Amino acid sequence: MISSKPRLVVPYGLKTLLEGISRAVLKTNPSDINQFAAAYFQELTMYRGNTTVDIKDLVKQFHQIKVEKWSEGTTPQKKLECLKEPEKTSVESKVPTQMEKSTDTDEDNVTRTEYSDKTTQFPSVYAEPGAEQTEAVGDSSSKPATPKATTPPSSPPPTAVSPEFAYVPADPAQLAAQMLGKVSSIHSDQSDVLMVDVATSMPVVIEEVPSSEAAEDVMVAAPLVCSGKVLEVQVVSQTSVHVDLGSQPKENEAEQSTASSVPLQDEQEPPAYDQAPEVTLQADIEVMSTVHISSVYNDVPVIEGVVYIEQLPEQIVTPFTDQVACLKENEQSPPVSPKSVVEKTTSGISKKSVESVELAQLEENAKYSSVYVEAEAAALLSDTSLKGQPEVPAQLLDAEGAVKIGSEKSLHLEVGITSIVSDNTGQEESGENSVPQEMEGKPVLSGEAAEAVHSGTSVKSSSGPFPPAPEGLTAPEIEPEGEATAE
């Protein structure tokens, strides 16, 4: 007869484990049996390890080595509590706890260890000159920065920072603007130099202060493209007007004309800038200069434009466009006095100098009513400095001349200057007392060979209304050289 009740199969070793845990509980008599049982099986598993020992032998050895010690005083429950307590303290140390204000003191904050999981990098505001400070990301040993240091400043101006510290903006555009601001601040004290970009600058209004010295510097930057590279050439032209008061005898005028006609052959490198003598402004002098700038590369014009600059008696208005600007000077001077006009050109960026060339020196008697001076100059700036050796030929009042300096690898610069000296008395000119002076020089190119150099200046005398300003530059005429003679 078959029984209908199911038959239960007891796994091997279960009886041995239950007997072992029962003996351990009876020997140690723990307060919490559940926690003791968990610690018992955990210690048994650690004691077994990776060995393949029979469960009966394992429980027997475990009771002889471990359970006997637990009965003496150290129980697995206490061991388990000791293991859990350091884990709790380590977790609590990482989580900041809110303390009461009465117990929070500065001394506690000094000895407290702080941890930061996140580190934010910002531009160093307190960087010392010559040394850069970098923050280590993820370095828990260093204390986190204070909120004032971690919050990036909203681009403070460079002047707000003390001289001991330097602010380096993270934005490249701000860095470039800051560097340009420093450069402009360095050159701000040089009031006599005016840097103008013809393509991008806006009209500039400068108040003119009446003084005894009339000097003007104009710097024009023009890009030149050569073999796929863009080169920027800055040309600085200085124009000074020299007016002497009072009338002088004919002997002094003759001496001055003779002295001015001597060519400057001994001077190889004249100074780039000469001090303008004092000028007392009394009558009306109108000087209108026309500057024509064009770049030539391999006998092909690249950039061409005319620059006009207009100057009024009380202010200088400089309107700039892509190709045109006008200069017009109205100054006060006595109707009759000797005058000299000097124009100088230098190259600022590449530190190449173009020697100064004296265009014209006019001396007239007190009876002259007006003098019209027209000059044209064309110069090519080369890698070597130009040395001018002007000579003064004898020509009539209606003669015209030009200055032209050639080079193959240079910027072609043409300058035309018209000087009009008016007189309110309206006296007629006298042919007997006229003293024409014209100058012709040959600037010598040091280094590479250049084209033929010819220079000249035209002087026209008129008593009628002012002639119109030249609309463009005419082709320069080559004039023969000669010695200066006064007619």
UniProtKB/Swiss-Prot annotation:
Residue ranges with Acidic residues bias: 478-487
Keywords: Calcium, Cell projection, Cilium, Cytoplasm, Cytoskeleton, Flagellum, Metal-binding, Phosphoprotein
Localization: Cytoplasm; Cytoplasm, Cytoskeleton; Cell projection, Cilium, Flagellum
Residue span(s) of domain RIIa: 12-49
InterPro entries (alphabetical): CABYR, cAMP_dep_PK_reg_su_I/II_a/b, DD_CABYR_SP17
Assembly behavior: Interacts with FSCB.
Protein name listed in UniProt: Calcium-binding tyrosine phosphorylation-regulated protein
Comp. bias (Polar residues): 420-436, 455-464
Disulfide feature: none
Post-translational events: Phosphorylated on tyrosine residues during in vitro capacitation. Dephosphorylation affects its ability to bind calcium.
Region described as Disordered: 78-163, 243-271, 420-487
Any single Gene Ontology cellular-component annotation: sperm fibrous sheath
Biased composition (Basic and acidic residues): 78-91, 101-117
BP-aspect Gene Ontology terms: sperm capacitation
Organism whose genome encodes this protein: Macaca fascicularis (Crab-eating macaque)
Ranges annotated as biased composition (Low complexity): 140-152
Main function: May function as a regulator of both motility- and head-associated functions such as capacitation and the acrosome reaction. May bind calcium in vitro.
Top-level taxonomic group: Eukaryota
SMART domains recorded: RIIa (SM00394)
Gene that produces this protein: CABYR
GO MF terms held by the record: calcium ion binding
